[in-house]
């Protein structure tokens, strides 16, 4: 299981832990990933995704999974999220 957010593309970063004496040692900054179930209003279906806490706040801010995916760039999304986005767009096109 990779440590990459499926919606925002956040991945581990590297840097230094710096002590009070300014000694530096290498470390990894891992994203705060959570396994969540998000519901699509258009499809009436739930999806299990592994997303960061920041992405979850953004989903809430934009008004749900459908609105988030409509605004999201395809290159930031995982393959699974891109498939969900395509399903939602197809369902909205047939409903309109």
From Swiss-Prot:
Top-level taxon: Bacteria
Gene3D superfamilies the record matches: Ribosomal protein L28/L24 (2.30.170.40)
Region (Disordered): 1-23
GO molecular function: structural constituent of ribosome
Keyword DNA-binding: no
Alphabetized InterPro entries for the sequence: Ribosomal_bL28, Ribosomal_bL28/bL31-like_sf, Ribosomal_bL28_bact-type, Ribosomal_bL28_sf
Pfam families, alphabetized: Ribosomal_L28 (PF00830)
Keywords: Ribonucleoprotein, Ribosomal protein
Keyword Ribonucleoprotein applies: yes
A biological process from GO: translation
Gene Ontology terms: cellular component: cytosolic large ribosomal subunit
Family listed: Belongs to the bacterial ribosomal protein bL28 family.
HAMAP family hit by this protein: Ribosomal_bL28
Protein name: Large ribosomal subunit protein bL28
Species of origin: Cereibacter sphaeroides (strain ATCC 17023 / DSM 158 / JCM 6121 / CCUG 31486 / LMG 2827 / NBRC 12203 / NCIMB 8253 / ATH 2.4.1.)
Gene name of the encoded protein: rpmB
């Amino acid at each position: 299981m990779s440590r990459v957010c499926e919606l925002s593309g956040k991945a581990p970063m590297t840097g230094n832990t710096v002590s009070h004496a300014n000694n530096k040692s290498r470390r990894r900054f891992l994203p705060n990933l959570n396994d969540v179930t998000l519901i699509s209003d258009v499809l009436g279906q739930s999806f299990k995704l592994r997303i960061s806490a920041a992405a979850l706040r953004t989903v809430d801010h934009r008004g749900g999974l459908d609105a988030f995916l409509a605004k999201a760039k395809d290159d930031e999304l995982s393959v699974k999220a891109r498939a969900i986005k395509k399903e939602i767009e197809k369902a909205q096109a047939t409903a309109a």
